[in-house]
Amino acid sequence: PTCHIFNDLAYHGEKFLSRTGRRKPMLLYVWGHSYELDENNGWTLLEDFCRRLGGQADIWYATNIEIYDYRQSCARLEFSADADRVYNPSCRDCWLYVDGQTVRAAAGQITPL
């Protein structure tokens, strides 16, 4: 999901954290402008959100360009004709969801699926 900083941020954060067990990789995209934080208790809302979601070992915290670069790497993945392996020609690991399992397609490697 995508969420503006003043659009039920705490709700979306809790929903994101409530995922359990093995799961499909997800993206929670939070957006807004820094000048908006001076209104409606914005700094407190964002700081509370960051405290709640921060420090999680299984969450990747990324900037816009990092997300873009990651998506570009995923788009370059090369799958075998029978889809039993994938080659990752990029310098960045990519993560796939295959048959209910999360699979790491290591940078520069062929990964069995």
Predicted regions and their residues:
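Acidic/glycine-enriched edge-of-secondary-structure segments
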Residues: 1-11
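C-terminal domain-boundary segment and adjacent tail
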Residues: 13-110
